[in-house]
Amino acid sequence: MSSLIMQVVIPKPAKIFHNNLFSVISKRHRFSTTITTRGGRWAHCSLQMGNEIQTGRRTGGYQPTLWDFSTIQLFDSEYKEEKHLMRAAGMIAQVNMLLQEEVDSIQRLELIDDLRRLGISCHFDREIVEILNSKYYTNNEIDESDLYSTALRFKLLRQYDFSVSQEVFDCFKNDKGTDFKPSLVDDTRGLLQLYEASFLSAQGEETLHLARDFATKFLHKRVLVDKDINLLSSIERALELPTHWRVQMPNARSFIDAYKRRPDMNPTVLELAKLDFNMVQAQFQQELKEASRWWNSTGLVHELPFVRDRIVECYYWTTGVVERREHGYERIMLTKINALVTTIDDVFDIYGTLEELQLFTTAIQRWDIESMKQLPPYMQICYLALFNFVNEMAYDTLRDKGFNSTPYLRKAWVDLVESYLIEAKWYYMGHKPSLEEYMKNSWISIGGIPILSHLFFRLTDSIEEEDAESMHKYHDIVRASCTILRLADDMGTSLDEVERGDVPKSVQCYMNEKNASEEEAREHVRSLIDQTWKMMNKEMMTSSFSKYFVQVSANLARMAQWIYQHESDGFGMQHSLVNKMLRGLLFDRYE
């Protein structure tokens, strides 16, 4: 790391205006104000207040938030108390003993798999890696003629970043190697694990592609005839969304429900899962309250009534992306990013005129307080909130990591706003882009780049210039994550957005270009998601970035598919199923 880094001066956050100061926005008024920075500097700006032009402005038709500030601040949980932490420590020790017991090899693998699904494997990561390495990677303790055990081992080894070849499945293929053996169709448990394992495939792994097709075909048939209720439930969940595409904590509650119904359930594991869930929920509530206080203090939702007030949903996203318990700072930071991306997106998609949007883009490109002078009042508060936030995050990174992230973070936000402007021009021109033209811009406009850029600098222990530059140029893992995020979002929100007058999304672009039906277009987008996941899987195995940042990048894609899995807008339109999942994770304790 360069010794010159510490000499670089980062512009510190300007003091945010008090909410009452912006109550004059709707009135004809002009005033000057002086803004104090953290370091004692003074930035002088003049705000021109005038009657807002309403003609031609769109409306998002978004519902009010279900979770107001006062309600959020009232949430509290007894599970943040020390006594629960001590009880959990005792249970963790007991489960650790279960892992170390000399039991059947398959039982140990099944326990590891259960711990992951229950959301408690983080307590045993070191032990799990040691077990997988000594028992299942360097030594072959599994009968490779057993499809169930082979597929389960393959899945877990890849999930824990071990390099394992798809060739382990060759013995299950027919003599010609063109498909899997027909004799496997009655092995429902084996087919389910084969199906799950196939989603960890990289580009060019044809055996795993065959495995996916074979397992999918026969699992759909088994659903109609199998009598095992617990197994049927697992199959239905997997066919809906495979484990590799699921986020951990938002799914933990439903898996606890499924686990406690199983005849082979371990009571200690179950009790730990329930206790741990409630303890994590208590932590999440404290983080949400802090993020909500920030959101309320910005005044954005009060002064810009056309934007989505979704701070709880913004926080919910972070629970699937940044999973480690110790990264509360990063979850709160990511919540703020989500809220700012949502606000600016609504400015561009709903309220701003093209002239105003061009002015806003220029101001972001220049990145200084003076640029605010050219903006209409409603944009000034938005600009200043973003300016303050980014500079504060850069300041914290320089303080904590010794690295000046300012130019990298600025570029992420500039690229986002420039992509928004391109889409705004398409809208005003009535332009219908091809799918290729749309994707070239929309993988940026989805907002994943600021998220991953900020997280890179917070989650990388030792930041190397080479990795920062690779991030700056948007490494393939960033592109893959953002592409899945975009496509999943389009599958859920495109109809609502087009009805509001937005530009065509990927589904509509394909329909226009190929004269295809909506279902044909959606099937094509699903295939693009699958192809991009294979790229993502390859990068997860080979990337030079830290393993945790790679995992977080994949989690961003996973969270998008979780939110939009029913192909409806679970964010902007407050879908009832998403609200149920949100309550289940953040507010309703597990009894």
From Swiss-Prot:
Pfam families (UniProt xref): Terpene_synth, Terpene_synth_C
Protein name in UniProt: 1,8-cineole synthase, chloroplastic
Species this protein is from: Salvia officinalis
Reaction equations catalysed: (2E)-geranyl diphosphate + H2O = 1,8-cineole + diphosphate
GO terms under cellular component: chloroplast
InterPro entries, A to Z: Isoprenoid_synthase_dom_sf (IPR008949), Terpene_cyclase-like_1_C (IPR034741), Terpene_cyclase_plant_C1 (IPR044814), Terpene_synth_N (IPR001906), Terpene_synth_N_sf (IPR036965), Terpene_synthase-like (IPR050148), Terpene_synthase_metal-bd (IPR005630), Terpenoid_cyclase/PrenylTrfase (IPR008930)
Coiled-coil intervals, chain numbering: none
The enzyme's E.C. designation: 4.2.3.108
GO molecular function: 1,8-cineole synthase activity; magnesium ion binding; terpene synthase activity
Keywords from the named record: Chloroplast, Lyase, Magnesium, Metal-binding, Plastid, Transit peptide
Residues the record lists as binding Mg(2+) 2: 345, 349
